[in-house]
Regions:
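Outer-membrane beta-barrel translocator/receptor signature
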Residues: 78, 87-134, 138-146
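Residues that define the transmembrane beta-barrel architecture of outer-membrane proteins
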Residues: 90-92, 104-106, 140-144, 195-201, ...
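Outer-membrane beta-barrel "beta-signal"
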Residues: 505, 528-541
Length: 541
């Protein structure tokens, strides 16, 4: 049907198309352009204005109280990145270190450890010995110690324990360095006649909070027991204890109580017993730039209490550049066989236990200037029973008597450390002590001046470590010939060390002590060892 309509339209329109082709061309005008023209008009300016606002609203003042809004946020979704991570460094729990020394020496260290989520245990042992008997008769000594230790975590509590044994063997070899002015003959002695040993067994346990608790209280309780004996029938056993309880206030201030004390029993030809206790409550106020801690130390003595002030003020004068600290404190300590033989092993071990009341006024400063990190300190110390050491009169084998005296000491210390080039750093320390002794002419065998300096280099890959250190000790007074004051020759010791790591497990070291060969004595007639090379290897596993 649609096709029929199209065909019919075609036939009807054809005659008109044919007739149009017969029209003359001059009869048709084609208009190509058409322009619209407006009548002349006059331009008028018009300024728009906003309509007048009709409203009865007046300005209002609102006071809104600040109120924190508790908003719970869902934990962020952590998605792993498609990046290759560097493998973490392997942690080794055990090591073995062995080395040889001259003259005729050996050193060995071993450590074995294991840890889990709620405990850690370990064992360590150390042995060192030197024998210069071929040069100086009986100049030889050795040291051996071993320790078992561990920590157990149970809830918010950490329990630490330690059990150890140590033995030190030495000889009173100073007889061969005596001079004729001592009116003592120089005699050869078999080793067993000048032999001394100190054997000690110790055990300790401590309890502390391993994490923050709801009461905002931190605490630590510690106790230690030891038994010490020597080769001359001296025996000592002691029990020490200490604790610290701190209550935090407003997250920054604190009230704390510290206590520490000990009880000792010494046996030789007679028994001696001595105990002491320090109890120190204090309050600490902390501000953004300063801290003040004030309290007092109560010391029971003869049925009464001695009271020492305890004050510490710390202030940041220049952020990181200068921090100063001033304070005063006092406490009681004890001089016993253990502390005396650790300081001077060449004493005559028939001693007197002695309490020592120590009072200290101090000022400190530390910080950094550019690359330099520094620290300075000055102390004015009074001690009621500072141990001094002089030779036993008329004893052919040199041993030292212990003398207690009231001594006032002014001690000045300055130290610093600074990198001078990449991987190269310089460090140093200077200490000066001036003694004012009540009943003696000098602080016998106490060091007056100490000087330390060091240069350390570490390679970029951390495999090479090289260092050189200088130690100097001087102004050590002694009683010459039993009648006059004199000073020991200065001790000057230069040491160098080189350590190289072949792999994460294996490294080696070489260390040379006393490169200058300075044998000057720390204790009268007990000349030190000369040049002491040490070569060794360390393996981690």
């Amino acid at each position: 049907m649609a096709y029929n309509k199209i065909i019919s339209f075609f036939f009807f329109s054809t005659p008109f198309m044919v007739n149009a082709q017969t029209l003359p061309t001059e009869k048709v005008d084609v208009i190509k352009d058409f322009e619209v023209r407006l009548k002349d008009s006059e331009k008028k300016d018009f300024q728009a204005e906003l309509p007048v606002i009709k409203s009865s609203i007046v300005p209002q003042t609102y006071n809104v109280s600040a109120k924190p809004i508790q908003v719970s946020y869902a934990p962020p979704a952590i998605r792993p990145l498609a990046l290759k991570k560097d493998p973490s460094a392997t942690i080794y729990n055990s090591f073995l270190k062995i080395g040889g020394m001259l003259p005729a020496g050996f050193e060995g260290n071993i450590g074995i450890g294991k840890s889990a989520e709620n405990y850690s245990i370990g064992f360590s042992a150390h042995h060192a010995q030197l024998n210069n008997d071929s040069k100086f008769e009986n100049q030889k000594n050795s040291w051996t110690e071993g320790h078992l230790f561990g920590t157990y975590y149970t809830g918010p509590i950490a329990i630490k324990g330690q059990l150890g044994y140590a033995i030190e063997r030495l000889h009173y070899y100073g007889y061969q360095f005596r001079t004729t002015e001592d009116s003592a003959s120089i005699t050869n002695f078999p080793s067993e006649q000048v032999f001394q040993s100190f054997q000690s067994l110790n055990a300790s346990i401590s309890v502390s909070n391993a994490k923050e608790n709801d009461l905002k209280v931190d605490y630590t309780l510690h106790t230690n027991f030891y038994h010490l004996k020597d080769n001359y029938a001296a025996r000592e056993q002691g029990l020490s204890f200490a604790g610290h309880i701190e209550k935090w206030i407003a997250e920054k201030h604190s009230v704390d109580v510290q206590f520490e004390g000990a009880t000792n029993q010494y046996r030789d030809t007679a028994d001696q017993n001595l105990s002491y206790l320090n109890l120190t409550p204090s309050f600490a106020f902390r501000h953004q730039i300063f801290k003040v801690k004030a309290g007092a130390n109560f010391v029971p003595a003869n049925g009464e209490f001695k009271i020492y002030p305890s004050l510490n003020i710390t202030s940041q004068i220049i952020p990181k550049g200068l921090i100063i600290e001033i304070g005063v404190d006092g406490k009681r300590t004890m001089e016993n066989l253990k502390s005396l033989t650790q300081f001077n092993p060449f004493i005559k071990t028939r001693i007197q236990l002695q309490p020592n009341d120590r009072f200290n006024v101090y000022a400190k400063a530390h910080g950094s200037i550019g690359k330099l990190t520094y620290e300075g300190e000055i102390n004015y110390i009074t001690e009621s029973a500072l141990p001094l050491f002089n030779l036993v009169a008329g004893d052919v084998i040199p041993r030292f008597n212990v003398q207690f005296d009231t001594v006032k000491t002014i001690a000045i210390m300055v130290s610093g450390k600074m990198p001078i080039k990449e991987n190269l750093s310089l460090s140093g320390k200077f200490i000066s002590r001036t003694f004012d002794v009540s009943n003696n002419d000098a602080a016998w065998h106490r060091i007056g001046v100490e000087l330390e300096g060091g240069l350390t280099y570490t390679s970029n890959n951390q495999k090479l470590l090289a260092s050189i250190f200088l130690n100097q000790y001087s102004r050590i007074a002694y009683l010459k010939g039993g009648i006059e004051k004199a000073f020991l020759l200065p001790i000057l010791e230069l040491s160098a060390q080189l350590e190289y790591q072949f792999s994460p497990r294996i490294s080696s070291y070489i260390k040379v002590n006393n490169l200058t060969g300075n044998e000057n004595a720390r204790w009268l007639y007990y000349n030190r060892y000369g040049i002491n090379p040490n070569l060794g290897l360390q393996v981690k596993f």
